[in-house]
From Swiss-Prot:
The lineage of its organism: Eukaryota, Fungi, Dikarya, Ascomycota, Pezizomycotina. It comes from Ajellomyces capsulatus (strain NAm1 / WU24) (Darling's disease fungus). It holds the Pfam family Nop. One of its GO terms (biological process) is rRNA processing. This is Nucleolar protein 58. Residues 486-499 have a biased composition (Acidic residues). Residues 445-635 are annotated as: Disordered. PROSITE patterns: NOP. GO terms for cellular component: box C/D methylation guide snoRNP complex; nucleolus; small-subunit processome.
Length: 635
């Protein structure tokens, strides 16, 4: 089999032919190729196709890096298709796979056996290609490497989102450092003025006040209208007058103010960085930003490495991106896998509650996957004036998807959706943002909490206690049924009837007398009904008491269930099925289903054995009877 060697150089393609067909199987290639004469004895130049210009060299090299066969290389390989049983040594395995797909009877070889051969070709390339000087070769290689690096930097989409990855990482670091420094300022200056930290919650306002005022004694003379409102300023100055803090030296104050200045500088730079990140996200991934927001989108891109890598991920991967630890732990322990990762912090998922969070995460990840592919892979057309589409037009898909998801979430939750920018807690309730400053009223003295002498009256009970007492009274009135005697009731009714009759007689009209008689009859019926109801209630109460007394004579169901180690409902079920067994002392114990089955099988076996024995006894008795009858007949 004839062996050809393909050498890709900065000057062009060189096709070399090996003089020995078994050149790759030889073990002395390194020793033979140490000199130019040895290399020329092993192979010779078959064909050389030179690049026309630097632009052509760049195009060909860029295609080779991606593992593609260019038309120029395909024409070169067609020159050896007439050879019988051709094998071609290639340095790059990707290029070898691409050559194998061509409709040519060429068998590419791209393994470790060709490394020594290509090392020798690179060392002695000018001797193998006539007319190629070593100085020209180095110049062409340097120019090609520079142009190739420039081409990669210009056209690589991964280089743009590097700014986002670095910005979000720096933003997280700034938040940590800012919180640490702000807490250190409060703790440090708190020795001198501890009440200020309780009034001012905002770290920037606190640092500005410390930087402007300095010592606590200067608060009365300093104007803080630029930093604080008038009400808060008055409270701060009043607290400074009666502060319980210790005195500090000027050197201590200088160090505290230097740290406060750092806090203010960090906070201003953080705001600038956050606005820069929002602008970069809107420009690079407008649809993703419209769906999940700037911070969540930037964290997703940073976690995936680049926008292109994230766009290649399916929706299921985007949904749990950032929850890899929980995912692999769940797979290892065979538990439920997590429903969301970094995407959980999106506002749409935050507004969902309960089981709807998982559904919303799935919907949002699916829409985000589509939006990411549009952001990463779409080439936006340019109009006649050379203007690209606006940011709103680029983010149209993301805005439509968000509107659709908001409608779906509103239908699932049955409530209106909160506007963007509202902080949402995990339970779906908007979180109250911390105020910059608070005025806490001092707790007043409660004289009712003191002890009292015997002559004094008790303090009035609180409204909560009064409500409880009223409820207890109502319950007692409902529970207690006052039952009057039948005779007294009848006497009261007769007295009422006599009074009504007297009144009707005084009126002196028969119509009034008839009306009073009808009223009497109605009242009598009502009294009878009330008596019957009271008697029914009495009988029911007596029945309940008797049942309780009967049940109280022995252990209760709850006690028996506790002894058996079962719940009450389960104990009652097993008792009905006959699965509860009592020992000699009356303690219950339950039998499992397996034990019941075994007992039933043993009972069946015992019954069968008893039947067999009974049958045998019958046969014996019959045989004995037959023998007796035979003896009698003989006699």
């Amino acid at each position: 089999m004839t062996l050809f060697i393909l050498a890709e150089t900065s000057a062009g393609y060189a096709l070399l032919k090996a003089k020995d067909k078994k050149l790759l199987k030889r073990h002395d290639i390194v020793a033979e190729t140490q000199t130019a004469e040895g290399v020329s004895n092993l192979m010779k130049l078959k064909n050389f196709q030179k690049f026309d210009s630097a632009a052509t060299a760049l195009e060909e090299t860029a295609s080779l890096v991606e593992g593609k066969v260019t038309p120029r290389l395909a024409n070169l390989l067609e020159s050896i298709k007439d050879e019988k049983k051709v094998s071609l040594a290639v340095a790059d395995p990707k290029l070898g796979n691409a050559i194998a797909k061509l409709p040519l009877a060429i068998q590419p070889i791209a393994d470790s056996t060709t490394t020594d051969l290509y090392r020798a070709i690179r060392e002695h390339l000018p001797t193998l290609i006539p007319g190629l000087l070593p100085g020209d070769m180095s110049t062409m290689s340097l120019g090609l490497s520079h142009s190739l690096a420039r081409h990669k930097l210009k056209f690589s989409p991964d280089k743009i989102d590097t700014m986002i990855v670095q910005a979000i990482a720096l933003l997280d670091d700034l938040d940590k450092e800012l919180n640490t420094y702000a807490m250190r300022v409060k703790e440090w200056y708190g020795w001198h003025f501890p009440e200020l930290a309780k009034i001012l919650n905002d770290n920037i306002a606190y640092s500005k006040v410390v930087l402007k005022v300095g010592m606590r004694s200067n608060f009365g003379e300093t104007d803080l209208a630029e930093i604080l409102p008038e009400e808060i300023e008055a409270v701060v100055k009043a607290a400074a007058d009666r502060s319980m803090g210790t005195e500090i030296s000027n050197e201590d104050l200088d160090n505290i103010q230097a740290l406060a200045e750092e806090v203010i500088g960090f906070s201003t730079y953080r705001q600038q960085l956050a606005s820069y990140l929002a602008a970069r996200m809107t420009a690079i991934a407008p649809n993703l930003t419209a769906l999940v927001g700037e911070l969540v989108g930037a964290r997703l891109i940073a976690h995936a490495g680049s926008l292109v890598n994230l766009s290649k991920s399916p929706a299921s991967t985007i949904q749990i991106l950032g929850a890899e630890k929980a995912l692999f732990r769940a797979l290892k322990t065979k538990h439920d896998t997590p429903k969301y990762g970094l995407i959980y912090h999106a506002s749409l998922i935050g507004q969902a509650t309960g089981k709807n969070k998982g559904k919303m995460a799935r919907y949002l990840a699916a829409k985000a996957a589509i939006g990411l592919r549009v952001d990463a892979l779409t080439d936006w057309p340019v109009d006649a004036d050379g203007n690209e589409p606006t940011e709103e037009e680029k983010a149209a898909l993301g805005m439509q998807s968000r509107y659709y998801l908001e409608k779906k979430l509103a239908a699932m939750e049955g409530k209106p959706i909160k506007p963007r920018g509202v902080g949402i807690a995990p339970n779906g309730i908007p979180t109250a943002q911390p105020k910059k400053w608070e005025i806490n009223e001092a707790r007043k003295y409660n004289p009712d909490a003191d002890g009292f002498a015997g002559d004094e009256d008790l303090a009035e009970s609180s409204p909560k206690k009064q409500k409880k007492e009223k409820k207890d009274k109502k319950k007692k009135l409902v529970e207690e049924i006052k039952e009057s005697e039948d005779g007294s009731e009848s006497e009261e009714e007769s007295d009422e009837d006599v009074e009504m009759a007297d009144k009707s007689a005084t009126n002196g009209s028969m119509a009034d007398a008839n009306a009073s008689s009808e009223e009497r009859s109605d009242r009598e019926e009502k009294s009878k009904k009330s008596k019957e109801k009271s008697l029914e209630k009495k009988s029911k109460k007596e029945d309940k008491k008797s049942k309780k007394q009967k049940s109280g004579s022995g252990p209760s169901v709850e006690e028996m269930a506790a002894k058996a180690g079962l719940s009450v409902s389960r104990y009652q079920r097993k008792l009905e099925r006959g699965e509860i067994v009592f020992d000699s002392e009356g303690n219950p114990s339950y039998i499992s289903k397996k034990d019941l089955k075994k007992a039933k099988k043993e009972a069946k076996k015992a019954a069968k054995a008893a039947e067999k024995e009974a049958g045998k006894k019958r046969k014996r008795a019959e045989e004995d009877d037959e023998k007796k009858t035979k003896k009698k007949s003989k006699v």
